[in-house]
Structures are given as structure tokens and as C-alpha cells.
Amino acid sequence: FILLKDVINEVGADIARFVMLTRKNDAPLDFDFDKALEQSKDNPVFYVQYAHARASSILAKAETELDLEGSKKFLLKHFNLLLQMEERSLVRLIALWPKIVESAAVKREPHRIAFYLNDLASCFHALQHKGKINPEFRFIRVGQSDLSFARLSLVRATKSIISKGLLLLGINPVHRM
């Protein structure tokens, strides 16, 4: 067996905590050091942290390229512009956040938050990847400020939820990787 302090020394407290919280409290834990240090989607803490860092980067870029004054109004006002399947999936997942937190608290099952954050990160990465392949689906669309603001509202909500979720789990969100 390995002592928890040795695990923390090897991978860091945030990684150790997240990996532990991806298991039910009555389930055995097999800690895979290689996976915990991997920088890929197979490492849930990296995947979630990377989504937060990407969202931070996208919003920082938007501040330099767009006038973000009043952009808080756009989520509801221009919701009808979010037509892509990945956008709608992200909206549905974002809407689940309050129920996830309540369920995790009532049932004393913090792994629900960790699972949800991983799902949210996956959905966000899929949407971002679609924009890399096809410029039509990028978050920031020159000449289409309404659509850009609607998409940036999704980015802002995703970043906010990941940040709050990680903090609830006692993990510090990263803004750059």
C-alpha cells in the first residue's frame, strides 16, 4: 500500500483529491500514477482543468476583439441563435448544474460533481473542436456579434461552473496551462 502523503507528494494535492472524488465513497480506489500525470482526456482532472483554461483564454481573446459591454444580456436574448447540436447539448448540461449540486449535497456523494464536471468539459471540448475544424462554428465570429455573444455566454457559463465545481471539491481552477 501507498500512503496518501506519498501520493500527494508525487502528483499534487489537487490531482489526488480529484481522482479520489471520482469514486463513490464505498468503492475501492486503484490510483494510476501514470494516468494521473498524463495530459490527455483520459486524465479527468487535466481534462476539466484544461476546459477551464481554454474558456479563460477564449474570454480573454474576446475582450480584445469584441466590445463585451452588455454581453450578459445575450444569453437569453440570442439563445435562438444557438442551433448546433453541441451548443444545445452544452446548454442542457449547464442547466443541470443546480440539480447536480443539490443531489451531491443531499446524498453526500461528491463524486457526482466530479463526474458532471468531466461531462461538462467533454461537451465544451467537443464544441471547441468543431470550431477548429470549421470556422463557422468558432466562438468568436467576425461580423456576427449577436452569435458571438450567445456563444461566449456559453463559454462564460461553462467556465463559471467548472470554477465553482472545482472549488466545491477543494481544488483550485487554473486559468492557464
Predicted regions: what they are:
Residues 1-177:
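Non-catalytic interaction-recognition regions
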